[in-house]
From Swiss-Prot:
The chain crosses the membrane at residues 32-51, 61-82, 238-255, 275-288. This is Bestrophin-3. One of its GO terms (biological process) is negative regulation of monoatomic ion transport. One of its GO terms (cellular component) is chloride channel complex. The keyword Cell membrane applies. The keyword Cell membrane applies. Residues 533-543 have a biased composition (Polar residues). It comes from Mus musculus (Mouse). Ca(2+) binds at A10, Q293, N296, D301, D304. Residues 52-60, 256-274 are extracellular. Pfam families: Bestrophin (PF01062). Residues 399-496, 533-560, 591-627, 646-669 are annotated as: Disordered. Keywords: Calcium, Cell membrane, Chloride, Chloride channel, Ion channel, Ion transport, Membrane, Metal-binding, Transmembrane, Transmembrane helix, Transport.
Amino acid sequence: MTVTYSSKVANATFFGFHRLLLKWRGSIYKLLYREFIVFAVLYTAISLVYRLLLTGAQKRYFEKLSIYCDRYAEQIPVTFVLGFYVTLVVNRWWNQFVNLPWPDRLMLLISSSVHGSDQHGRLLRRTLMRYVNLTSLLIFRSVSTAVYKRFPTMDHVVEAGFMTADERKLFDHLKSPHLKYWVPFIWFGNLATKARNEGRIRDSVDLQSLMTEMNRYRSWCSLLFGYDWVGIPLVYTQVVTLAVYTFFFACLIGRQFLDPTKGYVGHDLDLYVPIFTLLQFFFYAGWLKVAEQLINPFGEDDDDFETNWCIDRNLQVSLLAVDEMHMSLPKMKKDIYWDDSAARPPYTLAAADYCIPSFLGSTIQMGLSGSNFPAEDWLWNYEKHGNRHSVMRRVKRFLSTHEHPGSPRRRRSFGRQASDSSMFLPPSPARDLLDVPSRNPHRGSPTRKQSRSQEGSPKLHSSMGELSTIRETSRTSTLQSLSPQSSVRSSPTKMPQVPEVLITAAEAPAFSADSHQHDSTTSILSLEFTGVQPSGTEQQVEPSGTPPGDPNPQTTSASTERDLFKFEEDLEDDRFPKRWSLPEFLESRHTSLGNLGPDPVSPRDALLLPDTETPSETNGIHPGAGSALAPDILYLMESLDKETDILEFNNEHTGESPKGTPQRPRTWF
């Protein structure tokens, strides 16, 4: 029988548990008083023998034995062993209570899913519910001594109404050496399937819900059976019991009061009654009694589960729910808050203190002064002042390595750029399109200014120029002649009219207009792609195709004509990348992989001329003719993904070029 005292400890008061200490049923006094009396009697008997019956020599020997037992009895880990054992027992006890079978969910499903107000429908619902209660009864009868005393045989089960005589015969005819608590579950499933076939259960989903819930109910019963079958290992129980009783057996001798005149350490007083030793026995032995009572909650102790009450309650409630309450509904009426959007139930005078406003959050009443609100430029000030003096930024800046543009290292590298990539989009305009302008036009981010200055400086990408370029071309139709064009770009941040090719060139030999060799530092050049004619020493191949939109392609021998380039930029300004344009397209020549490599200096190399103020007068090309080459560029872009040539550039150092003369990496398209 469970001892309930929840109402007495509902409120914390001064010495609130004092009333619980006076209870007898389910108390520690009722469990421990016998052992406590035995321990006190044994202690008193040994004390009387020591004081009255022993001689002087025998007393000296007993005193040495008492000191020895007191010293080494503390080495027994009673607290450690008891703590783990009682924790394990309490967890096991609570898990068994959580898994007690309750038929409330099943009776709800049966009452709402099995239809029919006639006698057959009523019989179906009551029979299904009776099978559910019979399953739990068979389990309780096998694990609980109190239930077994109530139903010692199956005849008592039939007499109690949980099983009919025909069901008893069928149950007994099943020859099985195992516990047959699962038989009512099979009957439940068969009867539910029959009700589905008869139309009493109108949907297969309802049948599945019934079977799922019944399977859950059966698993609760199986778990209780498993707890009864497999308990806490016997060794653990024996170790705990021996540790506790051995410790207090040693205390019977070791905690005796010795003669104070002998001067033993800790034996200055002779109180006759060992108060703290008795308290220690009360606590440790009572701790062990807690584990003994909770290790099997299906017994007949004061704090064991009320299994017989569970059987009665489940049967009464379940039959009431599926029979008398089936389709029994009260008349619907409007509630008292029908026209009130904010329902507010009344409070009594005793509960008036519990009427409190709704909780809206802990920060709802927190106020902030005007100085705590940041200004609009707080992020800029944080980046300007906080990051400038950042220690981590200084460490990273110190540990970072920067390669000088004039580094004498020779490096051979390759790179690949797919034809579907953005190779015709220059980096500067693309980056400008993604940049978000600051709110203040007179204030710019330091990082943004730094990126723009790096973007405009030809020396910035010197360390990036070690990668050679890979251009996708066609051996048959890529190298073709295009009509001349020119494009003028006034600002590096303005999107060009003609798509450009981003070429990352390694340190390669470059030739100036006066045939002098110069030191070509690595840079990123933004070229307007119109075609480049390689060295005259290479093999020339006639183009196999003509770009659409150019009916009269210009074909000129490479030995008699030169490729003219226009350099559109202020020669004295080093902030922006150099841009080259081809004023006219000559006969294209294809370079195979076998012919790659640095060529000797030839007087017939393409002459690269920087742009001047009058490019039209020199080349005869009007500046506004750049927009007429859009079909040619499209044709070239379509022919890029046919084949890939890998070009290799070797780092060779030549003499310095004069100031203002652009560097010319050798590139084949």
